[in-house]
A protein has these predicted regions:
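Conserved non-cysteine loop/helix-boundary elements of the Radical SAM core domain that shape
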Residues: 1-15, 19-142
Length: 145
């Protein structure tokens, strides 16, 4: 995977040579399944051409994929923000979404990420969601801030 992305960067160099990226986002699907080594290779290629000290580099993760080792590796590779795909703190709602994580894994992931620049993705309008459960999701997310 990393080689294909780096190849695309190399082939696009003439188009992007004068550009500066203010943000880089690894998301859409499950980038957290990629190895830290692959992410580091991609970031090395990007950093050598397109980013600066203030570039925000975000990495989207499912709660089940968060581990101290993975987070430490991503931070060392240059990631400076984690986007955690919580969606809901209620197991019934997570089940309705077909998510593989549960509320316990969310809390464990948040504990690991407590000193990391983190955003949380929530969903509204989930089957079986109530106004009260969504309010609860918001409140539980605010605890992390």
């Amino acid at each position: 995977m990393a080689e294909a992305v780096i190849n695309d960067i190399d082939q696009s160099e003439d188009l992007i040579a004068e550009r500066f990226f203010s943000s880089v986002y690894f998301g859409g699907g499950t980038p957290s399944l990629a190895s830290v080594e692959s992410i580091k290779k991609i970031l090395d290629a990007v950093n050598n051409r397109l980013t600066g000290e203030e570039t925000e580099i975000t990495f989207e993760m499912n709660p089940n994929d968060v581990s101290t080792k993975k987070i430490d590796g991503l931070l060392m590779a240059g990631v400076n923000r984690i986007s955690l795909g919580v969606q809901s703190y209620h197991d019934q709602e997570l089940k309705a979404l077909g998510r593989v994580h549960d509320s316990d894994s969310i809390l464990e992931a948040k504990k690991i990420l407590q000193d990391t620049n983190t955003t949380i993705d929530l969903m509204y309008g989930i089957e079986k969601q109530t106004p009260e459960s969504f309010t609860s999701n918001l409140m539980l997310s605010l605890i992390h801030i």
